[in-house]
Amino acid sequence: MSQLNVDLQEIAKFEALAAKWWDQHSEFRPLHQINPLRLNWIDERAGGLAGKKVLDVGCGGGILAESMARRGADVLGIDMGEAPLAIGRLHAQQENVQNIEYRQIPVEELAQEQAGQYDVVTCMEMMEHVPDPASIVKACQTLVKPGGHVFFSTINRNPKSYLFAIIGAEYVLRMLPKGTHDYHKFIRPSEMAHDIRNAGLTLKEMTGLHYNPITKRYWLAPNVDVNYMVHTIKTGV
């Protein structure tokens, strides 16, 4: 287990909260609130999800994965926490969403099994929870087909992101449990771009995800000071 690109403490945090994953008033409320934004952003840039084979890396309980399946994609969600995966399977069964599967497997291992098998790969709100983000990016590049799309999201590392993503979200607004994020694992856009280039992906777009605590509204804008999303493609034939 020590050789895997996994932080066991990170896995344990989300395992402990697994039963609340689909409760829109729980600690996962922010994920439910941002999901329509990120789903539409991915859908538009991928040229539509319907009929495509999609992999969601670090899927947790399946909020994004299931919503992509509802758009008509054939989805595999992978995670290293078994409890969230069990919640995802149960929810899909209850909602009769049949075009989705879940597996407990490291993305690097799946890349050895299924290289070039996916039209779209998503890895959202996960990069800042692993020891080696570059390894995740490379595995995603391996898994996507030539011409396919890979999407990432994470949190910038700077004083503003510390103030907003940790002090604000975890301590002041209490949107997230204390200890959800480790500032030192946040990833600057320049670092993300470096890993993307090294993996052989082409960076197409970065956009910021913003939140107003007064209006409780989320929106997308060019500023990537705190939360941001990335669209890449795998060029070649």
From Swiss-Prot:
Origin, by domain of life?
A: Bacteria
- Reaction catalysed by this enzyme: a 3-demethylubiquinol + S-adenosyl-L-methionine = a ubiquinol + S-adenosyl-L-homocysteine + H(+); a 3-(all-trans-polyprenyl)benzene-1,2-diol + S-adenosyl-L-methionine = a 2-methoxy-6-(all-trans-polyprenyl)phenol + S-adenosyl-L-homocysteine + H(+)
What's one Pfam family here?
A: Methyltransf_23
Protein residues bound to S-adenosyl-L-methionine: 38, 58, 79, 124
EC number(s) of the enzyme?
Answer: 2.1.1.222, 2.1.1.64
Q: Which InterPro entries match?
A: SAM-dependent_MTases_sf, UbiG_MeTrfase
Q: Which CDD domains match?
A: AdoMet_MTases
Gene Ontology biological process terms, A to Z = methylation
Family, similarity comment: Belongs to the methyltransferase superfamily. UbiG/COQ3 family.
Instruction: Report the function annotation for this chain.
Output: O-methyltransferase that catalyzes the 2 O-methylation steps in the ubiquinone biosynthetic pathway.
List the protein's name.
Ubiquinone biosynthesis O-methyltransferase
State the organism named in the record: Acinetobacter baumannii (strain ACICU)
List the top taxonomic levels of the source.
Bacteria, Pseudomonadati, Pseudomonadota, Gammaproteobacteria, Moraxellales
Gene name, please? ubiG
